[in-house]
Amino acid sequence: MEYTILILLLPLLSFLVLGLGGKWMSHRTAGLIGTAVLGAVAVLSYLTAIHYFTAPRLADGTFATLMPYNCTWLPFTPTLSIDLGILLDPISVMMLIVISTVSFMVHLYSFGYMKGERGFQRYYAFLSLFTMSMLGLVVATNIFQMYLFWELVGVSSYLLIGFYYTKPAAIAASKKAFIVTRFADLGFLIGILVYGYYAGTYTFQPNEMALLKGGAAMIPLALGLMFIGGAGKSAMFPLHIWLPDAMEGPTPVSALIHAATMVVAGVYLVARMFPLFIEYAPSVLHIVAYVGAFTAFYAPQCGMCAERHQACTGILHYLPNRFHDGGAGCMYISRPTRRGTGLHGRHVPLIHTRHVQGIAVPRSG
């Protein structure tokens, strides 16, 4: 699957071309480039999924974990380094399908919806950057690489929410989203540093020698801090306050960022770290459950009590969007495995909800 690197490189190239040369392009040319690139990315993602899920399984019946690309980026010590690469397992392949499909549909829909808008080329450049960031996040081979793309997602969402930079409401909304998620991401970063110090690695499997020296006692703290970052990105209570105002961006952006992909990042983080939660921090999973369940109950009440003048998209995001929060809360009751979460029935509602709301939000706008 050597072509999987193109899933990241193509949207990055689209961002650079549209960002640097967009002002010399017509709206039609910029839209065609952005949409064609995401169409190619979607095709590559589906090919990756077909090849992965049809490949022979391991002896115990589980899917293999593949790393088509992996290289050392920052070698701190002989035993501790930060790598960059691509990780393919059932969760990451599933998310590639979700992100590439919804992103392609948003690019295609925006071609007509944003017709005649000032900054059309800039809009497509930001969409490509956001898509590349989300794709890089879900195929990260280690927590530090995930954090790098995590922050790129935050920056690109800030740019998209504030796309109408002449509107005071859009400027305020983009700042609010950026600041609130930065507080949450600070907890994520501290958790990563704690994990790397006591686990002896930044991969998703701790170093057994480091754990034998007493590092296991600090893993629950590290995972709890990481969950704060996930709660902020997925707009869980009490870090949900940025999401309604973020609808000040273009309506297709609301479908891409807040309804379909970005808000799933926190749930993906919990799913990716689920084996560690089960083995080293089962008590933290109770906190995840309480926060996710309360958010799933509280957010629809906010939608019902929303002010009458609030945009329909601002109300809609409260409702089916909360299914993923409930899924994060209930994830801990499913059968744990040391090998990982794999692709189970609990992921099916996540896939369906992302696609359904990715369609519903543009229709409401």
PLM feature spans:
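...captures the hydrophobic TM-helix bundle architecture rather than a specific catalytic motif
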Residues: 1-365
